[in-house]
Amino acid sequence: MARDYDLKDYRNIGIMAHIDAGKTTTTERILYHTGKIHKIGETHDGVSQMDWMEQEKERGITITSAATTAYWKNKRINIIDTPGHVDFTVEVERSLRVLDGAVAVLDAQSGVEPQTETVWRQATNYKVPRIVYVNKMDKAGADFEAAVASVKSRLGGNAVAIQWPIGSESNFNGIIDLVTMTATTYNGESAEEEFPMEIPTDLLDVAKAKRQELLEAAANFDEEVMMMVLEGADVDIDTFKNTIRKATLTSEFFPVVCGTSFKNKGVKKMIDAVVDYLPSPLDIPPIKAYLNDQETDVVATDDGEFAALAFKVMTDPFVGSLTFFRVYRGVLEKGSYVYNSTKEQKERIGRILQMHANNRVEIDECRAGDIAAAVGLKFTTTGDTLVGEKSPKVVLEKMVFPEPVISQALEPESKAANEKLSLGLQKLSAEDPTFRTYTDEETGQTIISGMGELHLDIIVDRLKREFGVKVKVGAPQVSYRETITKSAEVEGKHIKQSGGKGQYGHVWLKFEPNHDQGFEFIDKIVGGKIPKEYIKPIQKGLEEKMAVGILAGYPMIDVKATLFDGSYHDVDSSELAYKIAASKALTKAKDLIGTVLLEPIMDVSVVVPSDHMGDVIGDLSRRRGLISDQEQRNDGAVIVRAKVPLSEMFGYSTELRSMTSGRGTYQMQFDHYEKCPKNISDEIIKKRNIQNKDEE
């Protein structure tokens, strides 16, 4: 079957923003104008097309990235709507991994906000070209120029206006296109229709000056056009557009457009900018992959061997497990087999679906550039590579996700619900790489871990709604870690030889701090002092002991262990004996290697009216917070940024509401681990040890 659209006519884009900047409404309007939906849904009414989970409809925020396909001016646009709440940063991360371009939505009054910085940084990591859409131009305090300036000052982004607003706040009623030097006005409150108009005389000089700024900024990326500008020659509109496109594709130049999505003003022009300036799959560099540990490139084409990346797994109430994937190369037909080169497993592709939020259309095949979903894959999880059954087993560059920082104990309200709870947790953890679940061996409790309180609230809610399991929830617990601060050489022995088959394991290990490098095991055994078959069990013994810690029962991180000596017994040595010997060595080393407790430190941004700033700063300081920055916003609010231990932030939203009469908001996300102050560390260790004794 031939392609409906050439690869050069594809646009795989994401809509990204701070919570409440209007990105779901913006996506709704794109779908409305491109003919995908016939009735507009409003987020505040709980009927948005893209927010299809019950929790999203109730809370008016986007939790999971819904995918949809739309068409505009002979281009196919695959859109992923991403969450703006930091607890769901993983959704943004995995979406950006498979997108070619993005629209960053800003609030015209607030400009760049805390979560904007986070998603912008993620997009920069993946080198995703962006256009900036300044939304809510009709809002009180809207300031287009200040919003553009905030991208430069706060994000370090080379943002340049390609449009200029006619009026602002309640007087916003038109847009000047700086490329074509034409103007458009709108009909009434909800602007279904656009009308051409002359550029208002009071804005003509401003528009000319801004057009020249735009031309000079874009010309920096095209020597030929730069020469034309320097010589004062005319640059025709097609050349001008091509120059802006070329600049945008470098990810170092960001065209800025404006509008108000809620009232339909500027949305069509924003879609035009997506089509004109964001990349097709052919415009981005080839994707990095590995074949037999050698780096190779995967070039976008239908003709090559099939290669795709699974970027999301979710449970659909009607079809079961859905795996979303982006095709980078080749063609996939329904009914065929693929090979999961990450898991080394064969999978059958029974059905292929194209998604529109939670509606689905069955398709026969998908090709390079497509984003689709497969039904019922058994082994594939987020970040896995899928290749043709008989293709070279390339593995695409992996996706990296942050570790969970907060935990809660769960208990089903009835024992009969245990099985349903287990099934629900298994499915939810398959969907979300930042959600973990395990059973505490000492207490028998089911523990869930995630990125924040809202993240875990949603999990508990989904257990109830989707799996019919009501649970009692314990108080949130901080995910502490243990690490070492000194080096030491330690002997570990596990020797039992008293008749019959004995046990003999004997090792010498050197432990060293391994800051930010995780666990590293080095084998320096020479001369066969320990046979090769026992080296892996020694490493395994250390890993198992590190998982439960040696100080207070928390996982250990950032340790280098070098095996440099030991001995063995011809008859009595075994894998188990060496595992135990290694574990004993680490336990014995506890005091010698300066084991300490680490606590998660959060990056906190609080937005408050300036008259409450002193109270907020004082309160954060009492919570052991270090104030890193304060910034005055145009609307009279202040952003206070601080690094605060997670343990001090429980219940902060209630406290902030009370302190600011409900006018303050905050965002927080994990930043790093830091050594606990001794008095707090001692208290935690004491409490954990008492707990453990009570349970013995």
UniProtKB/Swiss-Prot annotation:
Residues reported in the UniProt entry to bind GTP = 17-24, 81-85, 135-138
GO CC terms of this entry: cytoplasm
GO molecular function annotation: GTP binding; GTPase activity; translation elongation factor activity
> What GO biological process term is on the record, naming one?
ribosome disassembly
Domain called tr-type G: residue spans: 8-282
Provide this UniProt record's keywords sorted from A to Z.
Cytoplasm, Elongation factor, GTP-binding, Nucleotide-binding, Protein biosynthesis
What is its subcellular localisation?
Answer: Cytoplasm
Claim: Cell wall biogenesis/degradation is one of the keywords in the record: no
Carries keyword Protein biosynthesis? Answer: yes
At the top level of its lineage, which domain of life is listed?
A: Bacteria
The membrane-spanning stretches of this chain are: none
Question: InterPro entries from the xrefs?
Answer: EFG_II (IPR041095), EFG_III (IPR009022), EFG_III/V (IPR035647), EFG_IV (IPR047872), EFG_V (IPR035649), EFG_V-like (IPR000640), EFTu-like_2 (IPR004161), G_TR_CS (IPR031157)
* Task performed by this protein: Catalyzes the GTP-dependent ribosomal translocation step during translation elongation. During this step, the ribosome changes from the pre-translocational (PRE) to the post-translocational (POST) state as the newly formed A-site-bound peptidyl-tRNA and P-site-bound deacylated tRNA move to the P and E sites, respectively. Catalyzes the coordinated movement of the two tRNA molecules, the mRNA and conformational changes in the ribosome.
Q: Which family does it belong to?
A: Belongs to the TRAFAC class translation factor GTPase superfamily. Classic translation factor GTPase family. EF-G/EF-2 subfamily.
Protein name, please? Elongation factor G
- Tell me which species this is from: Mycoplasmopsis synoviae (strain 53)
Q: What is the lineage of its organism?
A: Bacteria, Bacillati, Mycoplasmatota, Mycoplasmoidales, Metamycoplasmataceae
* Primary gene name: fusA
